[in-house]
Amino acid sequence: MTKIAAETLPDAHFSMTWGPANFGFSAEKIAPFVPYIKQHNFHHYLLNDPAIIALLRKIQTEKGLVTSIYECSTNIRELLHTYFRLHPWNARINHFDCLGFYTFTQTNWGRPGASDWKRTLQGAITYRSDDHCIPSIRMYALMQGVTDIRYWDALLPYQNDPETAAFLKTAPAKVLRDKHDPEQPDRFRAEAVKLLKKLTK
């Protein structure tokens, strides 16, 4: 079906969300779809599979294909640091083009708790209020992570500087490796600021 659709509508942008392994997705099952799908959205749990990582790297070398990573926990007690703030770090280190969550905002679908601040039935990071969205603390933690990456980006033009190059070679990986330490991203920012001050004098 996917092959027929892609051949019938060659200019269409087909995307696929590859859920966690318990949905039965594996590198072997995903690979046949690669020639026909323009955007591949991977659940973050899939990155624990070396075969998926190898396939992901192959997809990322193909011109015109987009890769993204998403999370979708419905647990209101997910750790703000490891689950939300580090989500952008995980996306950047794994070379994804974009990141997301299964649901951005909870909506009034008649379900109990659909707009209840005490529940997040589909892993949403904002709440709906009439025609507006109200950010949750989860959204603010995600924004912290996005800002962390902006500090990283600010250093990229200075990679010819040996100190900056050495920092960028090890520091980002350390943030994810030591994810039990919520102060790691703040230390990264502080060091990035020091380097930027020195480099932009």
For each predicted feature, which ranges?
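Catalytic domains of carbohydrate-active enzymes that cleave complex glycans
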Residues: M1-A31, R111-K201
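Catalytic-core regions of glycoside hydrolase
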Residues: M1-P112
